[in-house]
Amino acid sequence: TALLNDGVDYPFELNYLDAFQYTLEGIREAAEYRSDIRISLEYKQSEPRVHCLLNNAGKMAYLAQMTGKENVGVTLDFGHALQALEVPADSASFLGQTRKLFYVHINDNFRNWDWDMVPGTVNLWDYIEFALALKKVGYDGWITADVFPQRHDPILIMEKTFEWMDYIFDVAEKIDEEKLAVMQKEPKTFEILDYIRSLL
């Protein structure tokens, strides 16, 4: 569920305290009504509103926690994390620690708009780090492609999405986590990058 119409286009349009409270109450009521169904809330910085009310991982995790309901969690869309200027691996790690990471969308963009491009074609390094973060938090839920073909054959776009994601997860699987952890303690930044590059 993406609450993207909840937000503002201009200053003073909205009482933010009331808006958050109404959102919290509405989600809590829905979660209580069907406690057997998980409600996964997706955040986005903007579109269709200029500023969406729930626009980053922290706010969405806070809302999910504030409901007090185990069946309320967060959808992490890689492209939305980029657009919000988050580090997707950090967002995955944070949400994974809260046990509120329910669902993952994969796509890519240039951080300026939600272009829904084939994952890894723009931000390959970020994707490998993201895949490793999902592994480290033990994420075993759904990962779905949220890509838009634009001017390309939709079947080809889906094929390439799966090819790129297989490649990304294969590279992440090759990473020696103990070796990486030792290098991160110093940190040996360029030794780390050279090591990851050697696995590509």
Locate each region found by the language model:
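Short, flexible/disordered intra-domain loops and linkers
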Residues: 9-14, 49-52, 118-121
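Conserved radical SAM core fold
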Residues: 5-9, 46, 108-115
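Short beta-strand segments at enzyme active-site cores
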Residues: 1-4, 38-42, 142-145
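Hydrophobic, aromatic-enriched interface-forming segments
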Residues: 22, 34-49
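Structural motif corresponding to the early beta-alpha repeats
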Residues: 1-18
